[in-house]
Amino acid sequence: MMDERRRMVQDLMERGYIKSEAVRRAMERVPREEFVPEDEMHRAYMDMPLPIGEGQTISAPHMVAMIAEILDLEPGMKVLEIGTGCGYNAAVIAEIIGPEGHLYTVERIGILYERARKKLRSLGYDNITVIHGDGSQGFADEAPYSRIYVTAAAPYIPDPLMKQLEIGGKLLIPVGSDKFYQELVLIERTSADDYRSRNLGGVAFVPLIGKHGWKFH
C-alpha cells in the first residue's frame, strides 16, 4: 500500500493541503491502513472519513494534513490531543514532533482507547501517551502544552483547555451550536490572561462529549 500512500500524499500536495516538508514526510510514514477496520482497508487512501466503530470516524487525510499545517509544529513540542479515535492523527503529529517531543492524547470511549493504545505501541510510538478520560477537561497533569488540538466539535471553547496552554501556545478547536456545522477556531495565548482567536472557516466534526462539551445520554 506504500504506492497508494505516496499517491495520496502527492494529491494532497497538489491540492494545497500539504505545504511543508515535515507534514509531507509524516503522512508518507504513517500507514493509514493500520488504523482502519479490515473491511475499510481498500478505502484507506481515499480522501474521505471512514467509520471506526462506536459512532466515530477517522478524519479524511486532507483534514489531518490541514490540522498539522495549521498547528505549525516543531520537534520537541509537548502537544495535547483531545479525541484519540483510532490513533492515526496522533501518529502523524508524533512523527512531526519527533522522539524529543511528546503527545498526550485523551479518549473517552474505552474500546477506542484500548485499540489505539495497543496499535500505537505496536507501531513503536514511544512519544505518545494515551489517556482514558473526559477530554473536554484536558489533561492538567502534564500542562502546560505548546499545542492543543481537538478532533471533535464543542458547543463552546472549554476553559480548562485555554488554561492548559503555555504562553505563546495555540489551541485548535471546532466550535458551534450546530451539531452538523462548526467553525474551526485557532486560539493563541498571548499572556497569562490574554488570548487572541481567528476563525479559519467551516467544518463538520463529531461532537465533543463531556463536562465542557455536549451532554448526551
From Swiss-Prot:
It is an enzyme of class 2 (transferase). It is found in: Cytoplasm. CDD domains: AdoMet_MTases. Transmembrane segments: none annotated. It holds the Pfam family PCMT. GO terms for cellular component: cytoplasm. InterPro entries: PCMT, SAM-dependent_MTases_sf. One of its GO terms (molecular function) is protein-L-isoaspartate (D-aspartate) O-methyltransferase activity. Catalyzes the methyl esterification of L-isoaspartyl residues in peptides and proteins that result from spontaneous decomposition of normal L-aspartyl and L-asparaginyl residues. It plays a role in the repair and/or degradation of damaged proteins. Belongs to the methyltransferase superfamily. L-isoaspartyl/D-aspartyl protein methyltransferase family. NCBIfam families: pimt (TIGR00080), PRK00312.1 (NF001453), PRK13942.1 (NF010549). This is Protein-L-isoaspartate O-methyltransferase. It comes from Methanothermobacter thermautotrophicus (strain ATCC 29096 / DSM 1053 / JCM 10044 / NBRC 100330 / Delta H) (Methanobacterium thermoautotrophicum). The gene is pcm.
